[in-house]
């Protein structure tokens, strides 16, 4: 048995004894025949940011071969707002490397994520998955390096409050049972996500924890490991689908919404990134942040206003991006600083062998911790279109390598203080601000669209569609208009409760 696969929780990987990246059509057919799979699901992202599903009953091996080889037709105009009904037929083709056994299906079912193709059999230019693929390709062409990412998926679980072992309001970070009520739900989600191919780092309860009208609202987080950016997006999409389905099965409600009530922590979708060459992390040089990393950060500093168009996509997003809520408001970056937009977290750069210190019986670890360093974009939230967001971040990081003054920009936007403290008001006032509404975000995207359309990454039609949707909210003054009105705020929250 391959020791690298011996602990892999994906049932197909365990059965075939090969990595999912090496799955072929023959492997899928073999697994279906040998394990009694009776149905196949095609799953694919649509314009609302959710996975859609097409079910197939396996009639015979010839039919199975046909759907795996040819895919199936779908109505693109019902999936994406930018596709006209008169020319809306698209193909969806399964990607065998994404195969997993549906953990919720009563009938044994194998599911796969799909790619979109147009009538000519070419990848659909404006599809979410293809946009991200093009962004990663352009990043590699410009830099000679590869772009990796991982997400921190925050969500609230909502259920009747038993009144027992009440947690401290807004103090739920890393809380344990019985004060944290949904640890078992989270760990079951993690197990299912891992079975579906998700590379999970860890899970924990988060800051948000409160009760309203006899209901407990508990915030949780599942954080992933850095992988190729396309895989990172796929894993986040499947994870959201799994969390919602398990909640539905158990009678809980779930929301990834950026804001669910005034004065309480909203849910973000922080994205960590690292740049890799020949399998080696390029974020550090001699134990400090490298010029490569600082160029990527400079690109994000420049394009941060328009990245909100992909990562903060409904009006409640901008009620989260306010001071003192552990969410960024200004365009800056720093080390281990949670008041900034881009944070450089601890990266195990210490010289000591902490494992040996904690465990005196252990020898020298000799572990290469340089692979761990990432940088984190903190503005996105659960309303994000995950593929567009990570594509936008790949574009921004690439853009930093196309700027002659990237290192100067990085130096100018660096901060090492809490910018929201009174004594740092001068520094705060010197920094550019993020947009404060969907309409303002649309304006920023329109001004900076050339960077995203360069190298044919984002299609003009997609950018036009995003701008049109953001402006349709008419929310330019909404934050000021209803900021102190709890009733109107709750109406807004309810409208976008199940976003993304």
Regions found by a protein language model. Give the residues of each.
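Short acidic (Asp/Glu) and glycine-rich catalytic loops that position anionic groups and cofactors
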Residues: 7-11, 167-169, 270-281, 366-373, ...
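Active-site capping/gating regions of soluble enzymes
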Residues: 17-18, 26-48, 52-120, 124-141, ...
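Short hydrophobic/aromatic-rich motifs at helix boundaries and adjacent loops
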Residues: 1, 161-162, 212-217, 362, ...
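Generic beta-structure capping elements
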Residues: 225, 276, 345, 486-488
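A hydrophobic, small-residue-rich beta->alpha segment in the mid-to-C-terminal subdomain
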Residues: 373, 380-382, 393-452
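ATP/Mg2+-dependent ligation/transfer catalytic cores
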Residues: 1-210, 227-241, 252, 388-389, ...
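Histidine-centered divalent-metal-coordination microenvironment in nucleic-acid enzymes
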Residues: 113, 152-166, 209-223, 257-279
């Amino acid at each position: 048995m391959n020791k690298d696969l011996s602990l892999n929780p994906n049932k197909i990987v365990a059965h075939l004894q090969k990595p999912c990246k090496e799955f072929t059509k023959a492997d899928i057919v073999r697994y279906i025949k040998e394990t009694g799979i009776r149905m196949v699901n095609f799953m694919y992202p649509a314009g609302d940011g959710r996975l859609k599903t097409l079910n197939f009953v396996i009639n015979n091996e010839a039919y199975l071969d046909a759907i795996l080889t040819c895919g199936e037709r779908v109505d693109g105009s019902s999936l994406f707002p930018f596709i006209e009904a008169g020319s809306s037929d698209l193909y969806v083709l399964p990607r065998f490397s994404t195969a997993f056994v549906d953990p919720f299906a009563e009938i044994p079912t194998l599911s796969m994520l799909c790619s979109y193709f147009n009538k000519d059999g070419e990848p659909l230019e404006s599809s979410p998955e293809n946009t991200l693929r093009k962004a990663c390709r352009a990043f590699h062409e410009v830099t000679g390096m590869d772009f990796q990412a991982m997400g921190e998926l925050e969500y609230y679980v909502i259920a009747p409050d038993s009144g027992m072992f009440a947690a401290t309001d807004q103090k739920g970070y890393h809380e344990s049972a019985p004060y944290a009520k949904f640890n078992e739900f989270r760990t079951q989600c993690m197990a299912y996500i891992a079975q579906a191919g998700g590379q999970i780092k860890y899970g924990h309860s988060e800051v948000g924890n409160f009760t309203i009208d006899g209901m407990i609202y508990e915030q949780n987080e599942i954080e992933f490991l850095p992988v190729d950016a396309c895989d990172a997006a796929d894993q986040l999409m499947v994870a959201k689908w799994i969390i919602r389905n398990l909640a539905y099965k158990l009678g809980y409600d779930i929301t990834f919404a950026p804001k669910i009530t005034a004065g309480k922590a909203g849910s973000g979708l922080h994205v960590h990134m690292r740049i890799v060459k020949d399998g080696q992390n390029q974020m550090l040089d001699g134990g400090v942040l490298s010029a490569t990393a600082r160029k990527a950060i400079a690109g994000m500093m420049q394009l941060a206003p328009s990245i909100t168009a992909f990562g903060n996509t409904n009006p409640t997003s901008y009620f989260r991006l306010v001071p003192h809520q552990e969410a960024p408001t200004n365009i800056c970056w720093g080390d281990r600083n949670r008041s900034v937009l881009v944070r450089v977290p601890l990266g195990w750069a210490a010289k000591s062998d902490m494992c040996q210190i904690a465990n005196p019986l252990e020898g020298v670890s000799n572990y290469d911790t340089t692979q761990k360093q990432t940088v984190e974009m903190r503005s996105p939230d659960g309303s994000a279109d995950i593929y567009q967001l990570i594509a936008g971040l790949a574009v921004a990081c690439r853009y930093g390598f196309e700027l002659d003054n990237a290192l100067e920009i990085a130096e100018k936007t660096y901060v090492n203080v809490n910018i929201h403290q009174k004594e740092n008001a001068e520094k705060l006032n010197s920094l550019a601000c993020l947009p404060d509404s969907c309409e303002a975000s649309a304006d920023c995207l329109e001004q900076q669209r050339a960077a995203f359309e360069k190298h044919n990454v984002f299609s003009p039609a997609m950018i036009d569609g995003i701008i049109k949707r953001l402006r349709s909210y008419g929310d330019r003054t909404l934050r000021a208009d209803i900021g102190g009105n709890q009733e109107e705020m709750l109406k807004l929250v309810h409208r976008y409760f199940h976003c993304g």
